[in-house]
Design a protein with these regions (language model features):
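Metal-dependent enolase-superfamily TIM-barrel catalytic cores that perform enediolate-based chemistry
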Residues: 105-215
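Metal- or metallocofactor-binding catalytic centers and their adjacent structured scaffolds
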Residues: 5, 19, 32-99
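A cross-domain feature marking catalytic cores of carbohydrate-active enzymes
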Residues: 38, 77, 119-121, 143-145, ...
Length: 330
């Protein structure tokens, strides 16, 4: 097992309710020809050092107690969610490559269907967000919210595009702000809003739902376990699924199935991470209603190649496994 930390440079400053970044880091793992990844996400509270330590401990334990192969469910015992994610992806990738099959097939998905992603515009001035919306020329845009001029920003973007608009507050609004803003923003034909309230406001989604805000609510940061899906099912319209926060493909797949059984819509999302993790997520996106898989478009120095983007359409790579390949020199 080999792992390393990669620095990802962002094309534009990534300004969201949690803070602003010009670069992010991610852990890349290789095991038996399979690749995995765990992005370092500030709000998740895990450092690269903690993830590497958990992976080292797991690898050392396997050397002391050797047996043939790994089982994917063994990663559940790892304390670090990031380490779980990286190892889960690598094991799935290695298994699919060994079988000579694409990842979607070993996940039990019957056919490749059309995937369409949104393109995210970080928080900025109304004029700058409108400029980026115009340049993006995308059919679906996601606008980061949580600033002082949210309404003006949405109005400016809507003034330059007929694209489908999604909003993402990353928990940056209070209950009162969300209840005041969302009915006003609904006039701009908003498809949905992600995580309008803080994770810390456990009862907030029920309260906000009762306000009849007129915009479908999707929970993101508030759902990092299957139990989280259950607890919010009555108070949201959909769930954002991310490999990194759930601990890999196995748990993400289970979360999709749980959400669907509860009548919730699902969106496959991503962190700021490389084409490796985002391509893996795209295989599971075949089971979801919506997708937000634009991270490779937001970074300058992607260490992997994988998905192909044609406008808002996302095309899976051919070949076995996840289908992501290290770029020359990595």
């Amino acid at each position: 097992m080999h792992f390393r930390v990669e620095r990802l440079e962002l094309v534009n400053p990534w300004r969201i309710a949690h803070g602003v970044s010009t670069e992010r880091t991610t852990v890349i793992l290789e095991r038996d020809g399979g690749y995995g990844e765990a992005a370092i996400v500030p709000y998740l509270g895990e450092s690269s050092a903690e993830i590497l330590a958990a992976l080292s401990s797991f690898a050392s334990n396997r050397l002391e107690h050797p047996r043939a192969g790994y089982r994917v469910d063994e990663v559940d015992g790892i304390a670090s969610r990031g380490a779980q994610c990286a190892l889960d992806l690598a094991l799935h990738d290695a298994e699919a490559r060994a079988r000579g099959e694409p990842l979607w097939k070993i996940l039990g998905i019957n056919a490749v269907t059309h995937i369409e992603t949104s393109f995210t515009i970080a928080m900025d001035t109304p004029d700058e967000m409108a400029r980026r919306a115009r340049e993006a020329n995308a059919s679906i845009l996601k606008l980061k919210m949580g600033g002082v001029d949210d309404e003006a920003c949405v109005e400016a973007v809507r003034g330059v595009t007929n694209a489908t608009l999604r909003l993402d507050a990353n928990g940056g609004w209070s209950r009162e702000e969300a209840a005041r803003l969302l009915p006003r923003l609904a006039r701009f034909k908003i498809e949905l809003v992600e995580q309008p309230l803080s994770v810390a406001d456990g009862e907030g989604f029920a309260w906000l739902r009762a306000q009849q805000i007129g915009v479908p609510i999707f929970a993101d940061e508030s759902v990092s376990t299957l139990e989280g899906v259950d607890s919010l099912a009555q108070n949201v319209d959909g769930i954002v699924i991310k490999l990194r926060k759930l601990g890999g493909l196995r748990q993400a797949h289970a979360a999709i199935e749980r959400a669907r059984s509860l009548g919730l819509r699902t969106m496959m999302g991503c962190m700021i991470e490389s084409s490796l993790a985002v391509t893996a997520a795209a295989h599971l996106a075949l089971l979801c209603d919506l997708a937000d898989l634009d991270a490779p478009l937001l970074i300058r120095n992607d260490p992997f190649s994988g998905l192909t983007y044609r406008g808002s359409a996302v095309l899976l790579p051919p070949g076995a496994g996840i289908g992501a390949v290290p770029r020359e020199g990595d």
